[in-house]
């Protein structure tokens, strides 16, 4: 996925995340495609937490984006499990209607306690995995 923004191109690299999480004692497969931003500054120092972006990710937290806010993981099809994209919080807010208009009101997976917990567990695991990919050079 790529889009042009003035003379700068933002490129998202598609990767296959393979993994499982435990939800209420049951193992769930949370493998999916994730479109990763390639412009995250992993050395950025977050004064609030005292951690670099890479250290935040190693702790299961999202890195801070160029807008000064944590990077969001957006469900492209609004389904858990489903493909995701890393986007800036400001983009997530600015295009909220367009990004979330694919499902009816009240139909969000977040209304299902098991799926919501599954996603929250995935999110923490994903950022740790993403940090390992950076450290390992993959």
Enumerate the language-model features and the residues they cover.
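Catalytic toxin/effector domains delivered as secreted proteins or via bacterial secretion systems
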Residues: 3-138
């Amino acid at each position: 996925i790529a889009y042009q923004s003035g003379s700068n191109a933002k490129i998202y690299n598609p990767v296959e995340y393979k993994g499982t999480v435990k939800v209420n004692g049951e193992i769930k497969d949370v493998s999916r495609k994730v479109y990763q931003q390639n412009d995250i500054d992993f050395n950025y120092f977050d004064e609030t937490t005292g951690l670099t972006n890479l250290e935040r990710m190693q702790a299961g937290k999202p890195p801070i984006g160029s807008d000064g806010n944590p990077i969001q993981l957006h469900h492209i099809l609004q389904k858990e499990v489903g493909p995701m994209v890393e986007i800036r919080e400001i983009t997530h807010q600015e295009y909220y209607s367009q990004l979330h208009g694919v499902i009816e009101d009240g139909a969000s997976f977040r209304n299902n306690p098991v799926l919501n917990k599954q996603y929250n567990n995935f999110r923490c695991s994903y950022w740790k995995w993403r940090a390992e990919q950076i450290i390992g050079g993959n």
